[in-house]
Structures are given as structure tokens and as C-alpha cells.
């Protein structure tokens, strides 16, 4: 058996495959990504609105060291340079410093992994609330209210409340999902009885047999 990571384009802040009260969250919530429009048009509008090249020059990409995100930062920089002739500096800091700066909002753009611990949609979204850790320093009364309501709701109602929270984060550009990583287990033919929890990760071979 061999655990591998699968990387795919993000369809939202919450990855595919997670359930809420046994309901497929993504299928029920639908696509909550906002339509921001053409990037070049947005750039021109910002430039015409008074944002100078020197303002863009002060933008930096913050990422935690040892996270494996350096290549992603290079790809982003390459795309910006090609499309807009912009090049942003990359600032790589220790994980502890990275977390501290995320929480107090001391950054312009940060490449941060967002995890759904235990496969919980609520836990993933709660990270952006003050009570759940205050990831990115985000604080909003409506977000907190809907997230709190989802904790006591059930079924499709709970999905709708969580989807509203996810939509709000994306519409306000608190977070912009780039890609998802999901762990899968490759198993040789004939192996049965393995129990694999990708969120642990835990591999239980107690009842494993080979046919």
C-alpha cells in the first residue's frame, strides 16, 4: 500500500468529497466561487483608478518555509510577470512567524494551506473566525452568526449555512483557493480489509488479508 497526494484545481475553499450529516457538501452547496471578471481588465481598472506601479512593487508573497509552496509562488509570479509585467518579491519565513503574521494580518498576499481536519467542513471554515483561530485576522459579525447557526442546524439547512460562509470568504477575497490536495491509498491487487483514514492519516492493517 502506498499513500499518494492528488492535486487538482480548487472548485472552492472546501474540497470535493466531504460530507455534512451524510450529505455531499459540494453537490448540495454548488459552485460558490464569485465571478471576478477578466484579470487584465481588473488590473487596468486598478491602474486607472490611481494605483501606481510603485504600489504594486510593494506587494510581496508570504509563505511558510518547508511547505513545498515555493514552486507555486514561482508559477504565480511568472503568470503576473507575463500578463501584467509585474514581479512580486517572495518572503519565506519560519512556520511560527508565518502563523503569527497571518493572524494579525501583517501581509499583502500569503500562500497558506487550509486544512479540513477530520474531514469537517465546519472546522475548515471555523479557522477564519476569531473563536476558531482567526486565520488571516478576518472578523465579521455575519460570518460568525451564520457559522454559529450551522453548529446546531442539521442536514441541508446546515449545508446552506456553511455554503453561505464559504461564499462570503470568497466574495470578500479573504481567501482565494488555488488547488486542492487529497491523500489516496494505492493498494496492490488482492489486498482486502485495509482501513485508511486520509485525515489522520491512519492505516489500520489489523484485518488486512491477501487473496
Residue ranges and their predicted role:
Residues 19-38, 51-54, 101-105, 123-149, ...:
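Short, solvent-exposed loop/beta-turn-alpha elements that line the ligand-binding surface or hinge
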Residues 6-8, 18-21, 65-69, 96-97, ...:
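Solvent-exposed loop/turn segments at secondary-structure junctions
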Amino acid at each position: 500500500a502506498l499513500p499518494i497526494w492528488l492535486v487538482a484545481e480548487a472548485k472552492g475553499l472546501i474540497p470535493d468529497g466531504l460530507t455534512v450529516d451524510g450529505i455531499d457538501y459540494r453537490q448540495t452547496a454548488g459552485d460558490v466561487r464569485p465571478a471576478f471578471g477578466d484579470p487584465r481588465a481588473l488590473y487596468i481598472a486598478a491602474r486607472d483608478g490611481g494605483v501606481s506601479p510603485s504600489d504594486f512593487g510593494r506587494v510581496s508573497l508570504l509563505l511558510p518555509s518547508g511547505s513545498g509552496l515555493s514552486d507555486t509562488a514561482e508559477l504565480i509570479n511568472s503568470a503576473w510577470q507575463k500578463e501584467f509585467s509585474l514581479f512580486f518579491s517572495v518572503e519565506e519565513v519560519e512556520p511560527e512567524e508565518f502563523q503569527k503574521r497571518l493572524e494579525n494580518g501583517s501581509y499583502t498576499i500569503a500562500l497558506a494551506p487550509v486544512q479540513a481536519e477530520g474531514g469537517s467542513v465546519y472546522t475548515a471554515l471555523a479557522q477564519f473566525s476569531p473563536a476558531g483561530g482567526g486565520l488571516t485576522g478576518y472578523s465579521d459579525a455575519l460570518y460568525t452568526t451564520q457559522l454559529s447557526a450551522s453548529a446546531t442546524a442539521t442536514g441541508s439547512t446546515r449545508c446552506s449555512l456553511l455554503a453561505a460562509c464559504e461564499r462570503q470568504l470568497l466574495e470578500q477575497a479573504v481567501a482565494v483557493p488555488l488547488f486542492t490536495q487529497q491523500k489516496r491509498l494505492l493498494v496492490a491487487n488482492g489486498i482486502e480489509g485495509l482501513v485508511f483514514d486520509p485525515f489522520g492519516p491512519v492505516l489500520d492493517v489489523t484485518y488486512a488479508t491477501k487473496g
